[in-house]
Each structure stands twice: as C-alpha cells, then as structure tokens.
C-alpha cells in the first residue's frame, strides 16, 4: 500500500508508456497502475490522494446491475436516487454537490444534457464498463471545472481477446442480454464489439403524489436500455499506435411526473435519453517520453414527454447537447518521478425547447485549458503538485493549483498532507436560460485541506484522513427573484477510515465515515447526505463457490418536502442494508450467478417521497469462449 523507494522508479520504467491512457497495467509486484490522479501512469500505491480501482472482475463478483450499485460501495460516496432502475440519481462525494463530481469516460468529460450540470450515472449502461478509477478530493488543477469533490473515470471496452455471452433475469420483470467479443486481425490490429439490451417493468416509485407536482400515478415505473460499442486499435510500429471508438445508448424511463400546463391531458411521465459518442486518438512513445492526442464528439438528446402525445408533441421538452473535445497530453519520466503537461479544448452547444416548443434556447461555450502536473520522490518524501489555467468564453481566465506531500517516517507508515483549489463553472442553462438565466454568474470556488496517515500493520492496510472543504459562490435558484445567483456558501468537514485485510480465504474491506456538510450561512445540514456511513465488503471462495457479502449503514439524513410551500425539512432515518451474491463455474466456459439485494427487505428512502424496491433477486449466466 505505501510507496517504496524502488516501487515508483522501477514500475514507471517498466510500464509507464505501454498504453498509458488506459491505466490497466500492473507492475511486477502486482501494484496496479492508474492514470486518472495526475494524468500520467503511476502505481496506485504512489498516489497521495485517496484512490480506488474497480475492475470488471469486481463488478461480476458483486453482480451489480448499474453503476450506482458499484459506486455506493466505495469510500466517500453517497447516492440519492428517485426510486429504482433508470430513475434520476445524484452522486455526492465527500458531501459536495452532485455537480461537483467530474465524470470522465475513457478520459473524456461526460456530456450531460439538462440544466443541473450534474452527471446522472443511472443512465450509463453497466455492460459498457471495464474499469473505474475513482479519486477523492479536488482535481481542478488537473482537469478544470467540476472536480471539486472528486473524479470518476469510467474505462470502456474489453481487456482481452475472446467472446462472452450472458443473460439474466430478476425481480420486477428485470431481464438483460449482453454480448462482447475482441478479435485480432493480423498481428497489429484488434477489433472489439459489444452490445446490451436491458429491460425492467419496475415498480411504483410513488414520488409523494398527489401533491404540488402532479396527480397520483399508481403504475409501474419501468426502464428499457439498448447499447452498442465498437472499437478498433492498430499498432503502426514500436512507437505509434492509434484507436477509434464509437458507442451509443438509448434509454427510456417511466416516472411519476406532472401535468402539462398547456394541455391537462398530457401527463409528462416518460424520459428518453439518447447518446452517441465518436472518438479517435494517436499515441506515441519513445524512451522517457510519451504523447497522446484524442479527438472526441458526443451528442445527447434528453426528451421528457407524455406517451399519449409522443416526444415530438408541443407538450414535450427537449434538452439537446453537443460536445467537442481535443486533448493533447505529454508525459516525461524523471529519475525518481514523472511530469505531465498538455492542453485540452472543449466546445459545448446546448439547445433547449420548452414545453410549448415555441421557446428555443441555443447556447455555445468553449474552454481551453493548459496544465502541468508532477510527482517526485526524494528519499522518504514524495512531493506532488499541479497547476492549471482555463480560458472560458463566458468568464475568462481561471487558475487553480494543488500540492501534496507524503513522508514515510517509518517503514510501512506514511504521513500525508495536501491543499488544493477547485472550481465549478456555471453551465449554459444557468447563464442564458429564459427561466432565470444570469449571464453575470461567477464560478463556484473551493479550498480544501486534507491530512492523513496510512500504514501496513500486520495483514491490515489502512488509511485515516481528515478534511475540510470551503466552497464559495454556490449557484442556487432564488424563488424571490426567479433566477440563478451566487448566493450560498458551504463548509464540509469529514473524517474517513479505510482498511483492507485477509484472514485465510476471507478478504475484507471496511470504510468508516463521519461527515458534517453544512450551509455556511444558515448552518443547515446539506440535504441527502448521510452524516455517518459504514461499509463492509466480504469476499471468499470455497469449493468453487465465489461468495460476496456487502453491508452498508446509512446514517441520519435530511431532505426537503417540495410538495409544500414553503418546502419543509424532513428527516430520513438511518438504515442497514445487506446484499448476498454467489457464483459457480459449471464448466471452464459457463458460469452461473445469483444475488439477493436488500437481503432483509428494509423499507427506506434515499429521496423523500420516493420508494426503494425492497428485496430483489437476480440470476445470470455467462458463457466465455
């Protein structure tokens, strides 16, 4: 776990420039390589910020049906979802807003339509995910806007040649069918194809209706999703390789909605989200230098409509977003460290059509950023730093920086301290929407301090961290002036302990968290964040049976009852949740899996007024050849 003097130097010299954008290599001593923390490859143990890696093997072992189910197991993560599969969700990292999390897909910023500026991970197909790298703490000095609470990098595709076919059934009419293959075309070309279809009848999420939002809807709120992925990679020579990828998904979700003011017969209770992504890149490596260039385009359409009248009716609404990205990154190996320098450019175009289709808003924003990151080891001390400047078409130049230091004061034990600044730029809808847009908005800004100690005590690898995050100029909607303004401040304090150890065939992972997220002006607790969390993951294998037990305790939380005016604060009680999963290899090719989610059928809410599904059963089978 802790960094050794030989680990960083040896690992980087061996693996640093072998497909460094993917971050899925391991060193000779089985220390995983990651790239997300500082935009260069490094052993996971050398990263000074808290970092977690989830592999495809982990996802299969846990039998997660969506990305939210994967992330909820990780330290610092709190998820609030409006019901079951496909319903809107919010992701909070260390108590920061859901819009303060930077989500990357294959290292490229996720394009998210809508006015919130927050990434809704409930809509990303789990079958698309090969690996997740998760960094806690500010990273705007590395990536720019949004990275106040942390960064999640979702890596797609398939990691080795072969073909996998799988199918699954579960509660509430759940069914999924999945296939992927990777084949070599000659010695230098690799083709990867994947597809998925998922369907669930769902259940009635209720959504606190009837109330101010709309009528009671005693129906199932289901979900259907389709996904296709294709990739091509070619090794031109020892120095150059290139790749091209295209993938897309179409999702449809039912929810408890609202009546349209212009047509009382139009009940807006269906969401259709369509996303298409095209990217290509070229990598070069030669000795101590490596470089990568990526170009990417994404288009997302987000409809909300009444099935009675259709998505193109005048009662429907549409958020459409286009995103262009260019990235150029360069990595240099030093004697006992690495540095990375580069630039990225992004253009976003957003179009929103109102519910009467007569009001159309079309906005464009572009951003150019330059960055420099580095890590250097000097004896028992590891130093890390980053600086970045962004030129935004709306608010001009904005600079951020961060620095960290780690001291291995005793063999196997390390003290770590860090400080970082971060920001969140206002999105186009907040700036220019006809419904309260404010072109004078300033970026939200944060300052975060963190101190910690980590060590290897017998079989136990552990880390204790304490942090404080002060966030200024928070953007919120004012009902008094009917517009968006920089009106709030937040102070978030937290303590986090993580540990992992093995006892014979049993593998244990434990997280203990205490969080105090408050509005700095009113001292109110920020909504939908648990003050205490306990997470425990137990995995073991006995007689070819691969078992997994997951426990999560969510402490007291608060929310708002938006069906009242003015909205009232309500308390959501704590809850303990258990999951049980088991898999069995019938043959060397066929594996069957079963899972019980919410084993003891606990009744609880993540969002006030929205029911959770209760106990659920899942059964899947996969065939590899």
From Swiss-Prot:
Gene3D superfamilies associated with the record: TonB-dependent receptor, beta-barrel domain, TonB-dependent receptor, plug domain
Signal peptide annotation: 1-21
One Pfam family cited in the UniProt record for this chain: TonB_dep_Rec_b-barrel
TM ranges: 163-170, 174-183, 189-200, 223-233, 238-254, 271-285, 287-304, 317-333, 336-345, 363-379, 381-391, 395-410, 413-427, 445-454, 460-469, 484-501, 505-520, 528-540, 546-561, 569-583, 596-607, 613-625
Keyword entries, A-Z: Calcium, Cell outer membrane, Ion transport, Membrane, Metal-binding, Porin, Signal, TonB box, Transmembrane, Transmembrane beta strand, Transport
Record membrane topology: Multi-pass membrane protein
Keyword Transmembrane: yes
TBDR beta-barrel domain sequence ranges: 160-625
Residues annotated for Ca(2+) 1 binding in this entry: 204, 217, 219, 221, 256
Source taxon at top rank: Bacteria
Residues given in the record as Ca(2+) 2 binding sites: 219, 221, 255-256, 269
InterPro entries listed in its UniProt record: B12_transptr_BtuB, Plug_dom, Plug_dom_sf, TonB-dep_rcpt-like, TonB-dep_rcpt_b-brl, TonB_rcpt_b-brl_sf, TonB_rcpt_CS
Gene Ontology terms describing biological process: cobalamin transport; monoatomic ion transport
Motif placement: TonB C-terminal box: 608-625
Binding-site residues, cyanocob(III)alamin: 90, 97, 115-116, 317, 528, 562
Recorded GO MF terms: ABC-type vitamin B12 transporter activity; metal ion binding; porin activity
Motif annotated as TonB box, chain positions: 31-38
Annotated family: Belongs to the TonB-dependent receptor family. BtuB (TC 1.B.14.3.1) subfamily.
Protein name per UniProt: Vitamin B12 transporter BtuB
Organism: Yersinia pestis
């Amino acid at each position: 776990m802790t960094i050794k003097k030989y680990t960083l130097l040896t690992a980087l010299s061996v693996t640093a420039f072998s497909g460094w954008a993917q971050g899925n290599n391991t060193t000779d001593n089985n220390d995983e390589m990651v790239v997300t923390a500082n935009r260069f490859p490094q052993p996971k143990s050398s990263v000074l910020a808290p970092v977690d890696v989830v592999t495809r093997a982990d996802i299969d072992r846990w039998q997660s049906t969506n990305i939210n189910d994967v992330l909820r197991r990780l330290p610092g993560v709190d998820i609030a979802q409006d019901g079951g599969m496909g319903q809107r969700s919010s992701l909070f990292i260390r108590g920061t807003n859901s819009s303060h999390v930077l989500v990357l897909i294959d290292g490229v910023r996720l394009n998210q339509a809508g006015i919130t500026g927050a990434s809704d991970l409930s809509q990303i197909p789990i079958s698309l995910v090969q690996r997740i790298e998760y960094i806690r703490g500010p990273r705007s000095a590395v990536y720019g806007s949004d990275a106040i609470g942390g960064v999640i990098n979702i890596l797609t595709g398939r990691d080795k040649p072969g073909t996998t076919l799988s199918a699954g059934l579960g509660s509430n009419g759940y069914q999924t069918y999945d296939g992927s293959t990777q084949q070599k075309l000659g010695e230098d070309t690799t083709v990867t194809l994947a597809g998925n279809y998922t369907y669930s009848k769902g259940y009635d999420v209720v959504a606190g209706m009837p109330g101010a939002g709309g009528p009671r809807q005693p129906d199932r709120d289901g979900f259907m999703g389709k996904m296709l992925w294709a990739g091509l990679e070619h090794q031109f020579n020892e120095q150059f390789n290139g790749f091209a990828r295209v993938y897309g998904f179409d999702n449809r979700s039912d929810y408890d909605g609202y009546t349209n003011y212009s047509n009382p017969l139009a009940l807006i209770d269906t969401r259709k989200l369509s996303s298409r992504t095209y990217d290509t890149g070229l990598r070069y490596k030669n000795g101590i230098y490596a470089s990568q260039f990526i170009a990417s385009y994404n288009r997302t359409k987000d409809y909300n409509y009444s099935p009675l009248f259709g998505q193109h009716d005048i009662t429907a609404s549409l958020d459409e977003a286009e995103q262009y990205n260019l990235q150029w990154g360069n990595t240099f190996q030093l004697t006992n460290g690495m540095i990375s320098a580069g630039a990225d450019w992004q253009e976003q175009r957003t179009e929103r059509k109102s519910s009467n289709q007569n009001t159309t808003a079309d906005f464009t924003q572009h951003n150019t950023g330059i960055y420099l990151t580095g890590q250097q080891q000097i004896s028992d001390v590891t130093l890390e730093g980053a600086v970045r400047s962004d030129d935004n078409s709306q608010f001009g130049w904005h600079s951020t920086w961060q620095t960290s230091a780690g001291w291995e004061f005793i063999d196997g034990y390390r003290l770590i301290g860090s400080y970082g600044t971060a920001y969140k730029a206002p999105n186009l809808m907040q700036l220019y929407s006809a419904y309260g847009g404010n072109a004078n908005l300033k970026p939200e800004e944060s300052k975060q301090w963190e101190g910690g100690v980590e060590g290897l005590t017998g079989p136990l690898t552990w880390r204790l961290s304490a942090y404080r995050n002060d966030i200024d100029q928070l953007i919120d909607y004012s009902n008094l002036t009917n517009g968006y303004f920089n009106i709030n401040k937040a102070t978030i304090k937290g303590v986090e302990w993580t540990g992992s150890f093995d006892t014979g065939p049993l593998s244990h992972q434990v997280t203990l968290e205490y969080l105090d997220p408050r509005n700095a002006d009113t001292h109110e607790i920020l909504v939908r964040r648990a003050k205490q969390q306990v997470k425990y993951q137990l995995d073991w294998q006995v007689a070819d049976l691969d078992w997994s037990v997951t426990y999560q305790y969510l402490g007291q939380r608060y929310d708002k009852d938006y069906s009242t005016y003015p909205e009232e604060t309500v308390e959501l009680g704590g809850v303990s949740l258990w999951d049980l999963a088991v898999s069995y290899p019938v043959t060397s090719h066929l594996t069957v899996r079963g899972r019980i989610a919410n084993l003891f059928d606990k009744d609880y809410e993540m969002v006030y007024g929205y029911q959770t599904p209760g106990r659920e059963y899942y059964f899947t089978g996969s065939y590899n050849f």
